[in-house]
Amino acid sequence: MLEVLPIQDKQEQEALCARCGIEFRTELLAYKALVDGELRGVCQFTMGADGGRIVDFAHVTDGYEFEPMFVMGRAALNFIDLCGVHRAYFDAPCDNETLIKAIGFSRNSDGRYEMDLTDFFKEPCKHSKN
């Protein structure tokens, strides 16, 4: 079973980040993706006046699965949107452009991955660029 859950304990966040090969940053919010109770990935993100930012988005070092990563990315964006922040950026190192675009991001004129979350979760299919 696929689960995407917030990481509420900073010690757990630090341990899970290590398993995904990313630096733990205490000031960041985080989600974890699990399949049948096994960690598949971690997303660390933040929100500010300029929008939400996915800072780290990494799968476990011993494997990659598209679906848990996709759902985790959408969950982080939904949380950002529910907090009243309606612009998001994907600033995490990630070489999987297909995944980044599937989550909903596209490059802006500066080459940065960005998306407008306004009404995105009311009708996500309406926003598809495919």
Q: Which residue ranges define each predicted feature?
A:
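Short glycine-aromatic motifs
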Residues: L2, L28, G104-S106
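Conserved active-site alpha-helix within GNAT-family acetyltransferase domains
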Residues: P93-G111
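Short amphipathic alpha-helix that is part of the acyltransferase structural core
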Residues: M1-R25, P124-N130
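C-terminal "cap" of GNAT-fold acetyltransferases
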Residues: S109-N130
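Conserved donor-binding loop and adjoining core beta-sheet/short helix segment
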Residues: L29-E67
